[in-house]
């Protein structure tokens, strides 16, 4: 690790932050060209409520959002949160990468920080107009918390615990990033022949303190949202625990692999296999050096476990939940796994370092393409849904108000033609582009209905509606509209338009 900084290194750091920030701007370009709202955004732009962040166990997110708007009702100030979040994440990524002191020269020094920015699972977090800032802030603070501070042991633990408590009150998934970043720092300390066990012990103690404080204070007193409570329960001990754990592993593995379908899986398989070989080479090389055999054995055991920690940190503690949220946004620690493989390969194979640097550009560029495709898909889908709602409103206006009290959907609209190819090429986008008009899904519909001034309530779809024979009030290749006992039923089972 670097003990001092020259004026040249500070200038270099500032440039790296600027260039990394520019990469973030390029990546989010589709969000600038069109006004994109995502999921919860539709609800907040209409009612301005911010209290849900508190009941979700994220009081710091609430505080930051109301402070930014100088009001307890949160109005839309996008793209300011996204810009601020990208700047913070760029700065934290460069500072963290700098502390790794990898033997990179010139513009290749930019590579490590890009792993934290170009992360396909981060795309979903960036889509939230209201949450993007605090989600990226949580990631940034987790990286900073993993650094080995040059203080006494007590201050080190307290400072790290304080940062991690802020992480948990901002966005809980930041804990996974902390675990992954600690794995990378541990590996770098070991390569530098520095003591790793004091660092491991202090970071474990700090993480435990933060988790206990969060559980005792925040969860016990603030978390009341049914959704959060339902998805935060640990797997109960018993014969079914292993089955549930394996199901979680399968679900998260499928989510990760959906970002790298078919031959694209080589973009992660090759770096991983090379890192495994590199780690073995470094272990053999270290075992031949003079020193305490006992110390080398314990250090070697820790290093062997690091790749498994880096992989397990991707879903993190979600693996231990009985009903976890299986979503791309909880897998943002993917960045740490990718950076871990890169660090091992750069340090284990100095003879081919230039080739590794150059070839690393390929998976990073792939992630850029995937993220831009995700943003374009969501933007196009939002435009299509808005146009569809306008058509539905026009059809509803032809029905006398006294004849219709509710609305129901059968199935859901077919995908817009301009997103089908992206969904086919990148299966992960299916989990990012979440449809808002679905059968018996009142929450998703309600947030759109509020914005579009549609007063009809969405009711559950009855089996009788699907088999009803009636006269259609409107019919085309998108939907068929009919009335069923004062309920306007939109039947989307018409198939795609040709």
Summary of predicted features, one role per range:
Residues 123-126, 174-177, 415-419:
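Short catalytic/ligand-binding loop motif for oxyanion handling, primarily in non-cytosolic enzymes
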Residues 20, 112-113, 160, 207, ...:
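Hydrophobic alpha-helical transmembrane segments of polytopic
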Residues 142-157, 191-194:
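Membrane-interface transmembrane helices that cradle and orient dolichyl/undecaprenyl
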């Amino acid at each position: 690790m670097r003990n001092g900084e020259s004026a040249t290194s500070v200038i270099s750091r500032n440039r790296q932050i600027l260039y990394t920030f520019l990469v973030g701007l390029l990546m989010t370009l589709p969000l600038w060209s069109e006004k994109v709202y995502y999921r919860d955004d539709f609800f907040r732009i209409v009612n301005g409520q911010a209290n849900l962040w508190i009941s979700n166990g994220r009081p710091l997110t609430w505080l930051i959002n109301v402070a930014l708007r100088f009001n307890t009702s949160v109005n839309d100030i996008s793209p300011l949160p996204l810009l601020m979040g990208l700047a913070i994440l760029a700065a934290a990524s460069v500072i963290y990468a700098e502390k790794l002191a990898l033997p990179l020269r010139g513009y290749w020094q930019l590579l490590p920080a890009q792993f934290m920015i170009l992360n396909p699972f981060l795309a979903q977090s960036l889509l939230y107009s209201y949450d993007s800032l605090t989600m990226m802030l949580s990631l940034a603070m987790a990286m900073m918390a993993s650094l080995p501070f040059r203080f006494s042991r007590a201050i080190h633990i307290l400072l790290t615990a304080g940062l991690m408590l802020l992480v948990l009150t901002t966005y809980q998934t930041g804990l996974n990033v902390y675990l992954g970043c600690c794995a990378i720092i541990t590996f770098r300390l070991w390569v530098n022949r520095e003591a790793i066990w004091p660092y491991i012990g202090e970071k474990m103690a700090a993480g435990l303190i933060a988790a206990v404080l969060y559980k005792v204070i925040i969860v016990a007193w603030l978390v009341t949202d049914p959704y959060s409570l339902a998805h935060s329960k640990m797997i109960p001990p018993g014969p079914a625990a292993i089955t549930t754990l394996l199901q979680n592993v399968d679900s998260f593995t499928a989510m990760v692999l959906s970002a790298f379908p078919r031959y694209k899986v080589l973009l992660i398989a090759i770096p991983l296999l090379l890192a495994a070989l590199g780690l073995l080479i470094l272990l053999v090389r270290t075992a031949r050096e003079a020193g305490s055999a006992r110390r080398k054995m314990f250090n070697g055991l820790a290093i062997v476990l690091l790749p498994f920690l880096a992989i397990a940190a991707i879903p993190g503690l979600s693996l231990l939940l009985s009903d976890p949220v299986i979503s791309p946004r909880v897998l943002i620690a993917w960045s740490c796994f990718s950076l871990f493989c890169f660090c091992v390969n750069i340090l284990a194979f100095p003879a081919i370092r230039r080739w590794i640097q150059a070839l690393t550009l390929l998976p990073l560029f792939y992630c850029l393409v995937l993220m831009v495709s995700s943003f374009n898909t969501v933007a196009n889908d939002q435009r299509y849904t808005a146009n569809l709602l306008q058509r539905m409103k026009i059809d509803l206006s032809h029905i006398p108000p006294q004849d219709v009290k509710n609305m129901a959907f059968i199935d859901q609209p077919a995908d817009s033609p301009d997103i089908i190819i992206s969904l086919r090429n990148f299966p992960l986008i299916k989990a990012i582009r979440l449809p808002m008009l679905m059968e018996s899904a009142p929450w998703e519909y309600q947030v759109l209905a509020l914005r579009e001034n549609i007063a009809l309530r969405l009711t559950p779809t009855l089996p009788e509606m699907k088999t009803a024979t009636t006269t259609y009030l409107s019919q085309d290749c998108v939907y068929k509209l009919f009335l069923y006992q004062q309920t306007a039923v939109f039947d989307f089972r018409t198939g795609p338009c040709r």
